[in-house]
Amino acid sequence: MAIYYKFKSARDYDTIAMDGPFISVGILKDKIFETKHLGTGKDLDIVVSNAQTNEEYLDEAMLIPKNTSVLIRRVPGRPRITVITTQEPRIQNKVEDVQAETTNFPVADPSAAEFPEDEYDEFGTDLYSIPDTQDAQHIIPRPHLATADDKVDEESKIQALIDTPALDWQQRQGQDTFGAGRGYGRGMPGRMNGRGFGMERKTPPPGYVCHRCNIPGHFIQHCPTNGDPNYDVKRVKPPTGIPKSMLMATPDGSYSLPSGAVAVLKPNEDAFEKEMEGLPSTTRSVGELPPELKCPLCKEVMKDAALTSKCCYKSFCDKCIRDHIISKSMCVCGRSDVLADDLLPNKTLRDTINRILEAGNDSTENVGSVGHIPDLESARCPPPKALSPTTSVASKGEKKPVLSNNNDASTLKAPMEVAEITSAPRASAEVNVEKPVDACESTQGSVIVKEATVSKLNTQAPKEEMQQQVAAGEPGKKKKKKPRVPGNDMQWNPVPDLAGPDYMMQMGPGPQYFNGMQPGFNGVQPGFNGVQPGFNGFHPGFNGFGGPFPGAMPPFMGYGLNPMDMGFGGGMNMMHPDPFMAQGFGFPNIPPPHRDLAEMGNRMNLQRAMMGRDEAEARNAEMLRKRENERRPEGGKMFRDGENSRMMMNNGTSASASSINPNKSRQAPPPPIHDYDRRRRPEKRLSPEHPPTRKNISPSRDSKRKSERYPDERDRQRDRERSRHQDVDREHDRTRDRRDEDRSRDHRHHRGETERSQHHHRKRSEPPSSEPPVPATKAEIENNLKSSVFARISFPEEETSSGKRRKVPSSSSTSVTDPSASASAAAAVGTSVHRHSSRKEIEVADYESSDEDRHFKRKPSRYARSPPVVVSDVSEDKLRYSKRGKGERSRA
């Protein structure tokens, strides 16, 4: 028996053992305090409530039954009952007496002490000639506690001694909190604008001494010495852990020295100087900076450089040029229609000035690096530019560099940059440094020059470039002699000596050959013969129209050998291709850009577009669905065609054949009836008459791959196959049931006819024959028995179909039932009747066996043999027929 309890935030219940069936709330609380170590219960209390009904047990005398689950929560403790004494009114009177005795103390205005009127004479003169600073110490009467001995007893003294530290503690708590301050207005924190509002009319208890003037009778906020620096208490602390060498004596210090003086920490000048040496020097003289970085107005280094964007394109200090435009309403250059809002910040120049000022080296040593901008574009080395086939005017006398296969940036030069530098005015030549321009530095140009020079260069550069292009186009129209390509470089040199823009062929008129085409073109497709710019995309030396499909590799480029054993294509375009050889590949009809195929010319292969996984799965599922839809109607159609063909062959074909030639009908066996038992259906060769079974219909290789690749698709395909096979099996069962009904009806119809034919056959004599019938030997019978057992195991379909013949050929039935037959055909009719009766006996026995097998859940006994047939009753034709049927089964 126990009570289960837990806090609201706890997860599991704790137990408290109990002796009886009930426990009171008070005892339960005491046990909880004891087990949870919550103390004596004076500071907090516990509220107990039922866990199921949330009922709180307020009365501690309530009884809680056993096995009850309760929730407990802690609440603040209830106030305890105070002890009432009879001396309390006397203590209150003592306090009133003390207040009445000390009512003439100055409490209203602590800045100016007020004295009672009896201390002044009738003329208003002070009776005591004591300085004002001594008034608070000598004039203010000290409360005499000794006079209270006559009025109060010993208990009141003890109570006063107890109350004095408590009041002192409350006063100290009020001083340390927010809002408390020293001097005038000190009081209760946070209210009445920081002024005390409760202590003005309260006097300190007996024994309280002011901590400022050491005089009892008033609180420190009412001390008359407030505001006097002579009474300010300086708090000092001992210099623990600080060496004397780091202390400096000063009257305003906060550390007390052993001598009684106060000191402060001495500043560490050595560490300060060391830190100052590590800082970058920003006190460089203005004369060390280049003149381009100085403002033309104030002649100082530009501060917040700004650029005039509508007139002279010069840079000034932002403040200088803005004040100049506002005051004079015109720019420095003299243009008047400019505003201060048209100024643009020159961030490049600002970054340059900041970097030079932060650097510690001289600007004359790295003049070339002044123009560099610390951004991502300049940090990256630009791709090398190919040289133009036409020479500019500026670089006419220079030696043209030869490009190599490897794009080495160290061997590439920039003649166009040199041309721009050399074509610049002479005014900027003083600042420019004539040295080779590196590939990474070519994008930055020359050194930063004055903004006027830069603006002139910007305006003059387009004109000079136009003139250079016109001058460069004239010599380009003349014929140039093509440099002879070495034999070893003819095959795989993608970058020959004569390179066009971006390593492509030039678009202007080039060397003329017999076909008027550029080198490497065979002139097959006129749309790609260099007329349309941007569509050639091939290197000289390559056949431009060698297709991107796998074919002959260079130097033939898709052409075979001619009778002269000379290669065509590549750089050998002096002879026509052999007209009797295979022609080269041409470009497929593809949309632009053709540069993609030009890049793929080296790989000689086209790549398929990337296909996402979702798109591939959707495509595979669609193909599988189409293939299943195509396969399903074909299978049903083939099944129906096979049934119709077999029915026609059983009914019409055999009847017509027997009516035309009765002898031929006796020799040819009836076609086997196809059994559709799904447990005994064998695999056989496909024929137009027999539809393929479900074993022959196998999924394609693609579907197998898909099924192996995607498990979900494999499961869906398996379900579809299973449902289709079940439909086919149900159709087979219905067909077999109909066939069994027809067979039973034919069996009952022919049983009487068979008995009559046997009786008639015994009465008639056997017809004479040239050769007597050869009886079957024992070995042949055993062989037939073994072969039939083997056929029943291996080929159950043919064996059952041959043993379950239910119909008689129309010729034999006609010969038996026709009473108008001639006497000349009596022998043939007798033989036919004899063979027909023997065959019917075998069929009846087999049918009875199959009927019993079907009765027992259609599980035929494989090794059960039908009743043996008398050998003497079986004729030679019957044996020949059985052997022929066995041969046909073996061939099937």
From Swiss-Prot:
It is found in: Nucleus. The modification Phosphoserine is found at residues 285, 404, 866. A zinc finger (CCHC-type) spans 210-224. The keyword RNA-binding does not apply. A zinc finger (RING-type) spans 295-333. Residues 375-408, 459-493, 623-892 are annotated as: Disordered. It catalyses: S-ubiquitinyl-[E2 ubiquitin-conjugating enzyme]-L-cysteine + [acceptor protein]-L-lysine = [E2 ubiquitin-conjugating enzyme]-L-cysteine + N(6)-ubiquitinyl-[acceptor protein]-L-lysine. PANTHER family: E3 UBIQUITIN LIGASE PQT3-LIKE, RETINOBLASTOMA-BINDING PROTEIN 6. This is E3 ubiquitin ligase PQT3-like. It comes from Arabidopsis thaliana (Mouse-ear cress). The lineage of its organism: Eukaryota, Viridiplantae, Streptophyta, Embryophyta, Tracheophyta.
